[in-house]
């Protein structure tokens, strides 16, 4: 499924651009209520822009090609498998794409359950058995059926709102303290350059810290997507697919795409910032049936 750093980077870029426009035009709300309204509009705005552009951004990021008409047996099998599983999951047929990468990976994205995309790497088609590939596709179909992208958009919107709100409150305080010469009765945010610089830095820092929340959600939904795959094609097929991933190449997708793929990077500074749970934990969760209840 399509998810996180590309999503986060787009959100961050939108917030920084909005902040720059507001600062240059002098549109600074001195009231807490006004600032909160602005934060809500821009916070959720960035999330929904990312959601609406998600298919285009994902395909562009990996150089994916949508299959309009299957050209060979492999593409025909892929399209038929996606169609069968989409019917089983009760969703409309997603677009199907292939992208060139040596690693075993796949992702799904889209603004709605009935307007989605499933993409798989050439490495997956070449190195996985049909049963394993079927399980990976079912994992991505489950992400779509669970509505993970919409849920993530709402979570990211709330996170964005608080990042904007808190950073600008602190920026106003810093600007007023460091350069705020103002006449009596005059409303001011202090030095506008200090305000913009502090607000931008704080938005970047708080945005990174807030990503812990979205990373947690990303890991949590991976367990549920694994369980969804097990229900669609069988638990053993999904376990076999995860075991195959343990021996696969290090993913070659851009770092910004890791949260959108089934096979996220396993090496990270901390599990707090990992988009995916360790593969061993995912396999154990399937064996115990923890998320199948």
Curated annotation (Swiss-Prot):
TM regions (residue ranges): 4-24, 34-54, 158-178, 193-213
Names of required cofactors: Zn(2+)
Topological region Periplasmic: 25-33, 179-192
GO cellular component labels: plasma membrane
EC number annotated for this UniProt entry: 3.4.24.-
Keyword Amino-acid biosynthesis applies: no
Keyword DNA repair: no
Enzyme class: hydrolase
CDD domains membership: M48B_HtpX_like
Triggers of expression: More highly expressed in exponential than stationary phase, it is induced 2-fold in response to model apple juice (pH 3.5).
Any one GO molecular function term: metalloendopeptidase activity
Subcellular location, record wording: Cell inner membrane
Family: Belongs to the peptidase M48B family.
Name of the featured protein: Protease HtpX
Organismal lineage: Bacteria, Pseudomonadati, Pseudomonadota, Gammaproteobacteria, Enterobacterales
